[in-house]
């Protein structure tokens, strides 16, 4: 009887050990980020989900953006997203190629004005021509 209890205890600890072992090679997608940094989270495997125009949170990209994009009033993928949310008429995409979404503005000129105050001029050229 004691050996059965001991065997059960060993199996329990072995199972817990498998789940609690830290994955040494894993990349952490947590923390604060800026959508203007390249790559924004220190790894191209993570995405920066903006909480504001210049600050966001690093997240694993799978499934997070679709939910966040719908919930956040200023995140957009197109001008139609901004109009649908009532946040503006122009989706100004971040000048960072690692960020696949943008921020809603009232107009293209407002987006260019805001981004020109934040980003280097060479990054802004790619936004204006897009």
Curated annotation (Swiss-Prot):
Which residues are processed away as propeptide to yield the mature protein?
64-69, 123-130
Q: Where are the bilayer-spanning segments? A: none
The residues the entry assigns to the signal sequence are: 1-26
Q: Which InterPro entries match?
A: Albumin_I, Albumin_I_a
Q: Which tissues express it?
A: Major component of both the cotyledons and embryonic axes of mature seeds.
Q: Which GO terms describe its molecular function?
A: nutrient reservoir activity; toxin activity
Post-translationally, this protein is described as follows, namely: The C-terminal glycine may be removed from PA1b.
The cross-references to SUPFAM superfamilies, in alphabetical order and at most eight, read: omega toxin-like (SSF57059)
Q: Write out the function statement from the record.
A: PA1b binds to basic 7S globulin (BG) and stimulates its phosphorylation activity. Involved in the signal transduction system to regulate the growth and differentiation as a hormone peptide. Toxic to various insects through binding to a high affinity binding site in the insect gut.
An additional note in the Swiss-Prot or TrEMBL entry is: The protein sequenced in PubMed:3755437 was probably a mixture of the products of genes C and D, PA1b being of C origin while PA1a is of D origin.
What's written under domain? The presence of a 'disulfide through disulfide knot' structurally defines this protein as a knottin.
Q: What is this protein called?
A: Albumin-1 C
């Amino acid at each position: 009887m004691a050996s059965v209890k001991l065997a059960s205890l060993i199996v329990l600890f072995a199972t817990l050990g498998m789940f609690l072992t830290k994955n040494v090679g894993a990349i952490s997608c947590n923390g604060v980020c800026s959508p203007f940094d390249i790559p924004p989270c220190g790894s191209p495997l993570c995405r920066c989900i903006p909480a504001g125009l210049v600050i966001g949170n690093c997240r694993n990209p799978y499934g997070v953006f679709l939910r966040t994009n719908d919930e956040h009033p200023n995140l957009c993928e197109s001008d139609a997203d901004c109009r649908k949310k009532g946040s503006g008429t122009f989706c100004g995409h971040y000048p960072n190629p690692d960020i696949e979404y943008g921020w809603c503005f009232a107009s293209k000129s407002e987006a260019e004005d805001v981004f020109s105050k934040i980003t280097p001029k060479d990054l802004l050229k790619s936004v204006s021509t897009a």
